[in-house]
Amino acid sequence: MITGTQLRKARELLGWKSSDLAKRAKVSRAAIVRAEASSGDPMITIAQAGMLVDTLCAAGIEFTVGGEPSVKLKRKDQP
């Protein structure tokens, strides 16, 4: 499961507003704002989390593990 902090950082890396992510992921903006307000468990459904992760990954975000959970933007030449 992603954290609210990861979600916010991923969105910011892409230069998206919460409304941009909401539209692309088909998740309400209120759910995104609520999720990002939490540093831990994002307080959204598993289905919503899945749609957000899928959307962010398709846009080039890579969620990293090990130590603190984080995110990074994949380089264009990476598979």
Show which residues each predicted segment covers.
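Short glycine/serine/threonine/alanine-rich loop segments
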Residues: 16, 27, 61
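Recognition helix of helix-turn-helix/homeodomain-like DNA-binding domains
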Residues: 26-44
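Cell-envelope/extracellular anchoring and linker segments
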Residues: 20, 24, 34-35, 47, ...
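Helix-turn-helix/homeodomain-like alpha-helical modules used for DNA recognition
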Residues: 61-79
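Short basic helix-loop element that most often maps to the first helix and adjoining turn
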Residues: 7-20
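DNA major-groove recognition helix of helix-turn-helix/homeodomain DNA-binding modules
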Residues: 46-64
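A detector for short, charged/polar N-terminal pre-domain segments
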Residues: 1-2
